[in-house]
């Protein structure tokens, strides 16, 4: 039924809800999302979600935003990030998927509460509060805005959903209409959401947000560092493997259970070193880190 709703939307004459390429993406991503949801959603919840999704798609709830980004694809991408990369479960994911329909008054909070529960409704209402705060404030890099945002969000799950949404937007950055829009988003993310991700232990997400922020604010420097890393990748990987081998042997001899990994430091981190130490790329000694 949802597939039929999607097919009907693609027949719209003016700026179609789905291009042919987006339609293919939708079917693929929707199947992936359902596979993840099956692991923690009851059949009853899934059935209710499918019915509501069919309804809101048919009513063009997810339309395109001011940058032309498909709202439904963005929502599904955000839900995938929230579940697979952050670890959010039932209540948060249902709230994430139904937030926009509630905001557009296609579904009411009372209906959500009756269909699911009060906790889902609570998260949606807090997401609505934070959305309203954004609409009324332009100085997102001010300390006052941050305090208001945290007081409005109240629940850490709301903050985690917002981090997932910003990561999704940053990955879609090339679809933003102009450089100015990308720079505004990058500035907001580097000032607010990357530090938040770090504070909440989402280190991989924090690094990606910072790298993408640099990409959108200083593309020349980003490309320079990326190229240098690519040029030295083979020798660096060999050195990391050689470095790890004796440590791994000693840990195994001690009978310890462990996980040891080597990783190249992020582009953002390397850029900070270049600036602070005022040295050429070739003089950086610690391009990688070992984590045990």
Describe the residue ranges of each PLM region:
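Nucleic-acid processing machinery
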Residues: 3-41, 51-65, 74-85, 89, ...
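Short, mixed-charge amphipathic alpha-helical segments
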Residues: 36-50, 109-119
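Short alpha-helical catalytic segment bearing the HExxH-like zincin motif
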Residues: 92-97, 162
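Hydrophobic or amphipathic alpha-helical targeting/insertion segments
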Residues: 97-126, 202
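Aromatic/histidine-rich interaction motifs
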Residues: 129
């Amino acid at each position: 039924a949802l597939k039929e709703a999607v097919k009907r939307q693609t027949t719209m004459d003016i700026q179609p809800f789905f291009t042919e390429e987006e339609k293919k993406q939708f079917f693929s991503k929707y199947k992936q999302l359902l596979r993840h949801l099956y692991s923690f959603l009851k059949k009853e919840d899934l059935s209710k979600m499918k019915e509501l999704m069919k309804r809101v798609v048919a009513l063009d709830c997810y339309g395109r935003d001011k940058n032309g980004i498909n709202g439904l694809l963005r929502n599904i991408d955000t839900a995938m990030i929230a579940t697979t990369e952050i670890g959010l479960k039932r209540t948060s994911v249902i709230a994430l998927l139904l937030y926009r329909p509630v905001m557009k008054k296609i579904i009411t909070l009372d209906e959500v509460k009756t269909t699911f529960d009060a906790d889902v409704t609570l998260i949606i209402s807090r997401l609505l509060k934070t959305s309203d705060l954004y609409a009324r404030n332009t100085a997102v890099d001010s300390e006052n805005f941050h305090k208001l945002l945290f007081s409005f969000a109240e629940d850490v799950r709301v903050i985690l959903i917002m981090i997932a949404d910003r990561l999704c937007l940053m990955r879609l950055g090339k679809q933003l209409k102009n450089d100015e829009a990308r720079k505004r988003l990058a500035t907001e993310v580097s000032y607010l959401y990357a530090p938040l991700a770090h504070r909440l232990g989402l280190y991989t997400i924090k690094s990606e947000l910072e790298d993408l922020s640099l990409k959108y604010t200083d593309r020349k420097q980003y490309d320079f560092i990326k190229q240098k890393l690519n040029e030295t990748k083979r020798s660096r990987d060999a050195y990391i493997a050689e470095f790890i081998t004796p440590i791994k042997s000693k840990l195994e001899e001690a009978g310890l259970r462990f996980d040891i990994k080597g990783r190249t430091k992020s582009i953002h981190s390397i850029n900070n070193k270049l600036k602070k130490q005022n040295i050429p790329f070739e003089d950086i000694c610690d391009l990688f880190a070992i984590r045990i």
